[in-house]
Amino acid sequence: METHMAKPKAPAGIENPVQLAVIGAAHGIKGEVRVKTFTEDPMALGSYGPLHMVDGRVLQVAAIRPAKEVVIVRFKGVDGRNAAEALNGEALFVDRSALPEKLEEEEFYYADLIGMAVLDEKGENLGRVVAVHNFGAGDLLEFRENSGPTVIIPFTRDAVPDIDLSNNTIRIDSITAGLDNAELSGEEDEAEGPESARGSRPRGPKSAGEPR
């Protein structure tokens, strides 16, 4: 499973940057790259318009196709494997104005959650969110512990009772989330929590790829 820590330094010239993706390894010899997106619909990445990098460069999607856990993207002007390899690790941003303006209550952009600090009931920092997944049974948050391993918990109201965007923090209920001392000490890498914690909790706009 690929994981990517965020949020890196944002690009200059964007008033309210939102990270949509991070570029991975080159794919083939024609300039394509593997891209991990933080959008609900990975195939919609090209619908947001120009994608900004931290160093000020701007990329536009020329072609996109699905792959396991990522999408394969060819950007305009990126020709050949060497050019593609030079993009490895680059984060891609858009201004928030490019996203649909209104969210429902208890709805969040996946991109907003990446990099948020995960706190337990006592306020202890457990790590930071590195990914949001959905394998068909509901949204899951993956966070990387301060000591190293990653943990997966259900993204439900019971397991994640508080999300504070202004302070960039998420508070979890350790028991409902299915965490125990063994998992937090690194003996287990993943925990999906009890089935009773998989209540409905809307996330991310359904039309995440539609430009304004």
Curated annotation (Swiss-Prot):
HAMAP family: Ribosome_mat_RimM (MF_00014). Binds ribosomal protein uS19. This is Ribosome maturation factor RimM. The PRC barrel domain binds ribosomal protein uS19. GO terms for cellular component: cytoplasm; ribosome. An accessory protein needed during the final step in the assembly of 30S ribosomal subunit, possibly for assembly of the head region. Essential for efficient processing of 16S rRNA. May be needed both before and after RbfA during the maturation of 16S rRNA. It has affinity for free ribosomal 30S subunits but not for 70S ribosomes. The keyword Cytoplasm applies.
